[in-house]
């Protein structure tokens, strides 16, 4: 069983003129996020970079909440396992660059890595799960595929 996973997810923009809210693009600005399963309950969160002073350090952290949801949806045997999350955020928060979309995609991709070790990430399945959480596929699709039309 895999006990740690790392992912790298890009910033995005879905505010593209006449394509506003119907197409999006990935940008060369990245959040790097990792998770390690712990032998004890709880969550430990270490964040550096953008938002390091403002993001929650508990289960309400968007990556952790999404990761937990993904673990349940993907049938991970211990969805309530203790977690150590590390994040190096380069995507500014609340600036229209998709930091929430990146957090959601990060959480789900981490869940995939833990729940389905050795199985190639199904990007279409990831999009379905991420869009259900985010509510706007134009925000999460480019974080998964690079460009979404």
Description of each model-found segment:
Residues 1-95, 113, 119:
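ATP-binding N-lobe of GHMP and related small-molecule kinases
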Residues 77-149:
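Gly/Ser-rich oxyanion-binding loop with an adjacent helix/lid
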